[in-house]
Amino acid sequence: LHNLLEIRQHRKPGESRGLFSRVKRVSAGHDDATPASDHVPVEEAATYAGSFVQAANQAVEGHGWNGPTLFEVSIEFECLGRMPEATLDELRTVRRIGSKPVRCIEGPGFHQARLAIALAGRSGFLNLLELDEFSARCEELAASLELTIISPALDPSEVIRLARQAEERLLAIDGQVQFSLVTDRPPSISAIEQAAQHAGLLAWGEGRFFKQQPGSDDIVFSVLPGDQGALLGFLMDLPRVEEPVMAWFSMVEAAKTIQQSLGGQLVDERNTVLSDQAFDHIARQIEDRVRVFVEAGLLPGGDLAKRIFT
């Protein structure tokens, strides 16, 4: 939860606090600030997003040996014969260097493996200290596990150049979708809790709730105490959510359920009341953003995306 809030604080002054702000500016030409689009009922969301989600799930997200290189740099190992599982387990113990996630990728033929470190993340781009530590750790593992490093030596200046580029790419595609519930009178804490429970949310404590991904510990969206006079804020962290369009409709449905229980209106950051057409327009913008992710070799909610966007 802390990470979700930190991103807005780390953005430069004047920058959008999330994807939603950028979306709303697209509709500025309409008198009522509501995008002109045909309403797609929430019940049809599966049809609306299903075809693209299926295609996106087929994208290469770095699970194979020939994964994306835009956001990671790696060191490859080779051993004589089949690489023992104990050796792979030892390589997998390297999960983070500094603030950057590291993952182990098994190679073809069962005699190769790779340790890949993220070039950038929400904490910034890979720095020289992290790169030096990563290289030293790989050399130590190669010596202790009797492995041969077969990849070329990393050029620090080139890696830093790639890391800066990776950070720029991540900043360009990163985004959160958010809106608020405003009411004339604040309801009781128990009323809020009952409304959230009725909407299928789990309590996080201190007036915070979340929707959990079925069958996993992943969070679909969060509901937080509102700011700037709002009662509640609804927040979806797009890069970390599987099937973001479906997650968006799920968050909208939960918000409407809570609104029916507590009253009030659902508004954007500028306190503009959101219509069904606005919600559907945003869904299409989210779908466009997912395409950008896939083109970059990432899949929202996938292993690599969740490692990078933390």
Q: Predicted segment positions?
A:
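Membrane-proximal, solvent-exposed terminal domains/tails of membrane-associated proteins
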Residues: 152, 163-178, 182-185, 195-310
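Short amphipathic alpha-helices in soluble, non-transmembrane regions
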Residues: 131-139, 192-195, 250-255
